């Protein structure tokens, strides 16, 4: 079901958007929707290879430098921001890529965008009902305090370049953890609507999964999307072997090959 929202009234003044211009005459535009509890720079290993594309990566409320309200912590709200920003920029011929929670954001956004805006959708280990199967694995991820802090420092160094010691980092981590709990609640609350959003996708869609993903159960997600969600004529799906949730980092070369096939040839092999 579509939200009754006027995209023209959505305030995008606080939305941070990273831009990397094409080094060659741009043939297409890529817009990347990042996932849960990350900074857009975690996709840098791949985005730096996109010399033929203008590349944009928004940072959602709760993940960027600005403050936020609880009602802004929602994949649907992130989608509203994304749509309003794309419409304002008047972008067309877009390849829309969503990783993890970003897959939900991208799919919600398609419900509001004008048809000519997006040429194809790429879903990288996307959020879905299948996540419920791995709920306890997700909950236990980075369970130890030192592991949480170490991961947070690596991920959000671009956001907090001036923090001097672990005490300062821990304060930011505590605030971030509180934000994540609220966002998690909203994500689960919206899952049924996400299911409906996936079913409305009519443009070419590419589903790329990681073989050893601790967050998205690979086989269940593959079957779920192919059997119940996106129509078979619109969806191509593949799996990157020996890879983890952030497949673009864990198996970089295989991921780049898969993305090359998608971007240049509109195809996706079953295995990479």
UniProtKB/Swiss-Prot annotation:
Highest taxon, organism lineage: Bacteria
Name of the protein described by the UniProt record: Putative esterase/lipase 3
Keyword Hydrolase attributed: yes
EC number(s) on file: 3.1.-.-
Keywords on record: Hydrolase, Serine esterase
Organism name: Mycoplasma pneumoniae (strain ATCC 29342 / M129 / Subtype 1) (Mycoplasmoides pneumoniae)
UniProt keyword Repeat, yes or no: no
A GO CC annotation given for this chain: membrane
Lineage: Bacteria, Bacillati, Mycoplasmatota, Mycoplasmoidales, Mycoplasmoidaceae
Family, as annotated: Belongs to the lipase/esterase LIP3/BchO family.
PANTHER family assigned: HYDROLASE, PUTATIVE (AFU_ORTHOLOGUE AFUA_2G14860)-RELATED, MONOACYLGLYCEROL LIPASE
